[in-house]
Structures are given as structure tokens and as C-alpha cells.
Amino acid sequence: MAKDIKFSEEARRSMLRGVDTLANAVKVTLGPKGRNVVLEKKFGSPLITNDGVTIAKEIELEDAFENMGAKLVAEVASKTNDVAGDGTTTATVLAQAMIREGLKNVTAGANPMGLRKGIEKAVTAAIEELKTISKPIEGKSSIAQVAAISAADEEVGQLIAEAMERVGNDGVITLEESKGFTTELDVVEGMQFDRGYASPYMITDSDKMEAVLDNPYILITDKKISNIQEILPVLEQVVQQGKPLLIIAEDVEGEALATLVVNKLRGTFNVVAVKAPGFGDRRKAMLEDIAILTGGEVITEELGRDLKSATVESLGRAGKVVVTKENTTVVEGIGNTQQIEARIGQIRAQLEETTSEFDREKLQERLAKLAGGVAVIKVGAATETELKERKLRIEDALNSTRAAVEEGIVAGGGTSLMNVYTKVASIVAEGDEATGINIVLRALEEPVRQIAINAGLEGSVVVERLKGEKVGVGFNAATGEWVNMLETGIVDPAKVTRSALQNAASVAAMFLTTEAVVADKPEPNAPAMPDMGGMGMGGMGGMM
């Protein structure tokens, strides 16, 4: 296929038009008084959102060169979202400012490589200063503030803070759509996995359709149990102890299941059988997790163990087990704390090494089940459109909060970027490098300027006043007041601000050093069908 090629100034100008189109659509959402953007959907109602990355991903431009520019900035938003989970609009605003300022200087004759060096120096200094001024997040109220700022909703802030307090920093917090209007929190403490009872005859509470076992023994195996003789020795020992039994196996079927059910109904003993969670290697790992949590052993042929040789000493124990049709929850396992900590450390190490997003998610789930628990925020709204928008905002707030726990918080509302201004301005450089540093300095002003513009104010006036204020004092666009941002609870996670700045600078530097752009030539439109000259079906009667 033939290619269309543009060089130097013409190439950069074409791409800049795409950058501006995308950034102008995204930046209207910045700040407490930012607006929404409506996205058309091929099916169903349109999506209304103020989430930068969602808007950026939707934008496709007709001109191939403009589209390439737009896609470069969309990558800034996407990468920031992957790393920090929020701050995508800030990243887009920073990228646009750096690209525009940079192009002015390249057009005026500056060397792009010199500009790139200056930009990299300035961003490195800014990030070091951000680390210095960031404060560790402490207590439930600080977490609530971070979440409330991101979601622009105090109620959501409180919910997320409560969820993190209950399940810990390693716990998993997921979002689900509620059937009602209200947004509420549901916390599952202990280890839960998605396998229910093998037979409904095993339930102990017919109203709730669940089996509750108090202080049970737990038999854990990766084998299929179809012959009752295999587990008879250990079953007799459990009956002598007068305790209920939970069996976790690959499957319990045939004669073994029938015998267990009959004896359960007769009242001989209280037993519930469930299938082992997961598949393949993940199943082995999850069974090992359950064994460590409950102080038991996995009875597997790989370790030379068979079910007939199992004793009560090789069984796990827990304070309580609740089994429903779909889930099993093990609460208060009596496993050795040191072994549990070692297992958590092992999973954390795997988390750092893995590159697969799916594996990362599954490892995070396993970590949460061992370390804390799982919290579910059920998002409610009056309409489906509002529900989607609300869910996106809460997702951002959740990511923002996790980022704050990792690297601490800085003053929000773009104030922290202005607080590193002096540090960046003090870098000694000459020529094009100095110009590169000035490009970053100009970009650092842009988020504050845009927040003020979205609030209906003159951005330049706010920026100039902020330069003269003490560190930490900023402009609260929601109220129009000048306040101490940290004390007022207007904060941003340091990780979000850092990622936005790094990713924006990276793409801007690449953009400025571009000298040629190659795109596919648009295919010519196919010629129209010739006129059939009145050849109707009537003239084809002889073919019948």
C-alpha cells in the first residue's frame, strides 16, 4: 500500500492539531468544577464521564497524521492510568503544554535534542522535590480525603476509607453494580472462594440455604473422592472428636457422596463437601494457601500422601466455616502466624516478578484472602447512565487512594506542581537545555490555570498569585478561597502527580524529536455502480 509522508514542520504541525483536539476535549473535566463529556455508544445509552483516559480512548480522527498526534497523548493518559490509576487529565494537560511550548522553540530554531535533555533534567529535579515534600498518609480521615477529592463525593470517600480500614492495605476492594439507588459497602472477612456445597442436603440453615460449621476440622486434598473407604479412617477420628468436618477435594461423588449425605441426614455427623477452587497449578497454590491459613496439610500424591493415611493432625481447623450454594468462607483459621507471613511474602515476591495482568490480579486476590479480606462496594444510581459514570469515578478514587498509601500525598489542585517550580527554576543550564527547562516550568503552571478556567476564573491571575504564596497554600476552586491545601484535605497522591509528569515529559520529548511522519494513503472511493437503465424484474419474465 502507498504511504503518505510528511517532514519536519509540516509533520509536527499536523500531529499538533490532533494533540490539541484530544487534549481540549479532555481538559474541560479537570478540577472540582470540571464539566462532563458525552461519548456516543453504538448500542445503548451514551456514556457521560469526566474520566480523562476513557475520553482519550474514544477519540479517533479522520486525518491519519492528526490521529497519530491524538494517539500519542492518549498513550500518556493510558500509561498514567496503568501505573497510578488516576491523574489522566493532569497528564494530558501537561503533555499538551510541553508539546506546544516545545514546538514554538523548535520552529524558532532550537535543537530538539538539546530541548529533550533540558526537559529530562527538569522532570528529574521536579520528581525528587515531589518525593521530598510528600507526606505519608495517616489514619482513616486522610484516606477519606484523598478518595473524596478524586470522586468529588465525600460519601464515597468515607466508604473507601472504611473498606481499606476493614480489609487492610493488601485487601482486595472490588466494585459491583447495586440493584438499588444507594451505594453501600459489603465486607467478607476471612478466606472466601467460589465453590459451594456438593449437595443441598448438607445445609444446616434451610431459611438461608447455607451450611454453617462451628470449629470444624478441614480435610484438604487435590484428589477425587468416590469411595468412602478412602476417608473412613479419618472420618471415624473426627466423629470421636465430636466436631463437624469440611472436605475440600477435586470432587466428591458417587458412593462417597451418598454415604456422607445419608449419615448427615441421620445425624451421625455434620459434614459438608465442596470442590477445590481454581484449576491446574493455581488450584494447587490455593489449596496450599487454605492449608497454611488453617494449620493443616494438603493431602496429595505428589508428597507421597494418600487419604487412608490421613489423621486429625493433618487436618486444618477454623473458628467457623459458612458454605452457600456458590461460595465457601473460612473464618478465623488457626494457622501458624509465621507461616502465613512467609506465604504472604512469597506471593508479594511473585507479584513483583509477574508481567501478566491476569496473573497479577489472581495473585492480588490470593494475597488479600491471606492478609485481610475482600470488600465489595456496591454502586447504586437512579439510571444506567448515572451508574456507569459513578462507577468510573469510584474506580478512579479507589486507585487514587491505593497510590496515596504507596507513596504519600502532596497538596492538590495543581499546587504541588507549582511548589516544585522554584527547585526546577534553580537548575543551572545553558542554550537549548535551559530552554527545555523553561518548557517544563511553563507546563507546571498549566493544571492550576486549567482548574481556574474551568471554575470560570482568569487562569493567569491565579497562577501569578500562587507563585507568591507559601508552600502548601493553594487555590480551592470549589469555594474560590486561598487555603492550606493539606490542612483543608485537598490532596493528591504523590504517585499520581509523579506518573502524570513523567509520562507527559516522555511523550513530549519523543514528539519534539520527530522529523518525519509516515501514514497509509487513504484508499480512493470505489466508483459508483452504473445505472441499470430501467432493467426491472418485469423484463426477466422469460426466466421463470
Curated annotation (Swiss-Prot):
One GO cellular component, as annotated: cytoplasm
Source organism, top-level taxon: Bacteria
Conditions for induction: By heat shock.
Keywords: ATP-binding, Chaperone, Cytoplasm, Isomerase, Nucleotide-binding, Stress response
Catalytic activity: ATP + H2O + a folded polypeptide = ADP + phosphate + an unfolded polypeptide
MF (Gene Ontology): ATP binding; ATP-dependent protein folding chaperone; isomerase activity; unfolded protein binding
InterPro entries xrefs: Chaperonin_Cpn60_CS, Cpn60/GroEL, Cpn60/GroEL/TCP-1, GroEL-like_apical_dom_sf, GROEL-like_equatorial_sf, TCP-1-like_intermed_sf
Any one of the GO BP annotations: protein refolding
SUPFAM superfamilies: GroEL apical domain-like, GroEL equatorial domain-like, GroEL-intermediate domain like
Enzyme class: isomerase
Listed Pfam families: Cpn60_TCP1
Residues annotated for ATP binding in this entry: T29, L30, G31, P32, D86, G87, T88, T89, T90, G413, N476, A477, A478, D492
Cell location: Cytoplasm
Keyword field contains Isomerase: yes
EC assignment: 5.6.1.7
PANTHER family: 60 KDA HEAT SHOCK PROTEIN, MITOCHONDRIAL (PTHR45633)
Function, as annotated: Together with its co-chaperonin GroES, plays an essential role in assisting protein folding. The GroEL-GroES system forms a nano-cage that allows encapsulation of the non-native substrate proteins and provides a physical environment optimized to promote and accelerate protein folding.
Similarity comment: family membership: Belongs to the chaperonin (HSP60) family.
Quaternary structure annotation from Swiss-Prot or TrEMBL: Forms a cylinder of 14 subunits composed of two heptameric rings stacked back-to-back. Interacts with the co-chaperonin GroES.
Protein name listed in UniProt: Chaperonin GroEL
Organism: Bacillus cereus
Gene that produces this protein: groEL
